[in-house]
Amino acid sequence: MCIRDRDKTIDRPALAKLVFGDQEKLSRLNAITHPNVKKEIFRRIQRIKEKGEASFIAVEAALLLEEGYQNDFDTMWYVYVDEATRIERLKEGRGYTEEKCHEIMAKQLPEEVFRKECSTVIDNHLGISETENQIKTAVESLLSLY
């Protein structure tokens, strides 16, 4: 199976099809990619700090808890949405089947772990304006600490 498009970029749906059904392949992919992702995240953070460009830095990436980022960051946030909404969004946004959605979600940490490890929970099922309000409140709270 080829996982490159004609322009030699990664064909993300093909890669997902290849690894999400095989835990060993997924683990190998994560072992290859995530150390490099982590290096790049911290390289960018260092550059931003050196330039004094921000009051705070937000990082959004897959597997933050699984890769131990909670030991590196001041705070962790969890953006929550119920399972039915997640499935609906994955089907609409990425064209996944319901089976594919369940397969992916079964490999993720349970919600309880995120709620335990993260200091802030953003409820993302109430619509974009309510989500924005929650984020604004959380950012203001964070900035008041520093």
What are these regions (language model features)?
Residues 1-3:
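Short, small-residue-biased leader/transition segments that mark boundaries at the very start
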Residues 18, 32, 44, 89-90, ...:
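Amphipathic alpha-helical segments that mediate coupling or scaffolding at interfaces
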Residues 21:
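Glycine/small-residue-rich loop that forms an oxyanion/phosphate-binding "nest" at active or ligand-binding sites
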Residues 24-53:
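Phosphate-binding/switch loop-helix module in NTP-utilizing enzymes
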Residues 29, 58, 122:
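Residue-level signature of catalytic and energy-coupling elements of molecular machines
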Residues 40-41, 70-72, 92, 96-143:
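Small-molecule kinase domains that catalyze NTP-dependent phosphoryl transfer to phosphate-bearing small molecules
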Residues 42-50, 56-93:
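ATP-dependent NMP and nucleoside kinases share a basic, alpha-helical "lid"
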